[in-house]
């Protein structure tokens, strides 16, 4: 579903007319085009429309995704479940998908996701024979986490997914880094909860 169609559904559910929502924000004709999927919208206008609907972006995207977690959250949830259930086949499928995304989009975070899955696979797959690869991948992930200037939700989840595999000294250093570099998000509940989980698991 396109974003405009999701907005229209929410607007109608709240009993707000096109004219009422568009008032002092944009023209009725523009809002109508956006809702039909015939026009894009700027972030600033979208923010104003959501504020009028008394809704934030997280809530809007949750509805847009058919009341399912977003792709990032879904990835960590699925990867963690496959690891805990020792589902090697699922881990391999996820890794293949992530690697294809990395090749297609050249976005480095897909690479780190693949490394995380490779680490999980090396632990649960009894036939896994590549010596030293798990340690090498963990080092690559650690290097990334130390290098990045600001930790957001992604970095915290990536670290949470690997911290139990790290040496105690490394965990202490990275947990301190996580706390310091994510401090600006302390009032954002989603990230704040992740910070608390990291600190709790460090103890």
Task: Describe each region flagged by the PLM.
Residues 15-32:
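Short alpha-helical DNA-recognition segment
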Residues 63-89:
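Short, charged recognition helix plus adjacent turn
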Residues 101, 105-111, 115-203:
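Conserved binding/catalytic microenvironments
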């Amino acid at each position: 579903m396109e974003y405009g169609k999701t907005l229209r559904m929410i607007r109608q559910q709240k009993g707000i007319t096109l004219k009422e929502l568009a008032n002092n924000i944009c023209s009725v004709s523009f809002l109508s085009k956006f809702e039909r999927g015939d026009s894009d919208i700027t972030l600033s206008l979208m923010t104003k429309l959501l504020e009028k609907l008394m809704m934030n972006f997280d809530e809007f995207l949750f509805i847009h995704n058919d009341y399912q977690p977003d792709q990032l959250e879904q990835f960590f949830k699925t990867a963690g479940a496959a690891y805990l259930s020792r589902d090697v086949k699922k881990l391999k499928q996820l890794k293949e998908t992530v690697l294809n995304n990395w090749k297609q989009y050249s976005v480095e975070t897909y690479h780190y996701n693949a490394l995380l899955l490779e680490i999980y696979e090396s632990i649960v797959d009894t036939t896994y024979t590549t010596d030293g690869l798990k340690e090498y991948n963990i080092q690559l992930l650690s290097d990334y986490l130390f290098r990045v200037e600001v930790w957001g939700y992604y970095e915290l989840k990536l670290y949470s997914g690997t911290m139990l595999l790290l040496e105690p000294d490394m965990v202490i250093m990275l947990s301190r880094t996580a706390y310091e570099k994510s401090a600006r998000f302390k009032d954002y509940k989603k990230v704040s909860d992740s910070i608390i989980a990291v600190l709790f698991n460090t103890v």
